[in-house]
Every structure is written in C-alpha cells, then in structure tokens.
C-alpha cells in the first residue's frame, strides 16, 4: 500500500470510531487536534487499525506515536 492508501484507511477507521464523517487526517495530524479523540477512543482506533491491517503494535510503539504519520511509517515497516 502507498502512504496515501494507508492514510485513507486510517481516516476511514477514525471516522468510524468517532462517528464523524468530516474528519480528514494528514500525516501531521495529532490526537489533540481532533475533537473527541481521547485516550479511550485512541485505544479503540489502535485496535481497529490492528484488525484492519492484521498487525499487533507493541505497547512502546503505541505510546510513541506522535502523529498519524508515525502510524503510517510503522505500518509500512511492518510490511503493510
């Protein structure tokens, strides 16, 4: 998958988690920039990403994701 395809998939997942079809993610988007993307919804998002991409993130990775681009990069590293 290309970075843009992964970003599109992540956008769709977050829209589903937050029930908000207006969300548009970029690689620079941080959680604190998106309304209602709190720690509970972050975990729901991460679990949905793991299911969609067939991966399992390490806790250290989850804690270190500073923005959406870091998630894209990690997924690419994992061969997705």
Regions found by a protein language model. Name each.
Residues 2-47, 51-80:
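Phosphopantetheine-dependent thiolation modules in NRPS/PKS and related acyl-activating systems
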